[in-house]
């Protein structure tokens, strides 16, 4: 079983943890993570955006938020994620998660699941996850992964 399968199977645990973090910092950080991973190759095709928005709406861990609001936020953040200057603002949203280790771990795991709803975890996406780990002061072992 691969890393993505392990994360997907941990859905109930992630949903329970996510309910602890019903705030804007968690919401914005998680969706920023998702957009940054989705934009890892420099583009986000309309089909990929639609698939990610659908995954956002169906993920139990994010049911504490309004699906439409999350989808709209993701679409906005996608534009930011491919613009090098606006990307820095997204990284700041991710860095805000660092003040709560469990929140940061949960957000990164959720972001990885959603952004990789196609089942492909590319080397570019892994590089972005490493950057996100650094931004939050976490390591691969904190997530239980090896990139």
Report residues per predicted region.
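Small-residue-enriched hydrophobic alpha-helices in membranes
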Residues: 1-37, 43-147
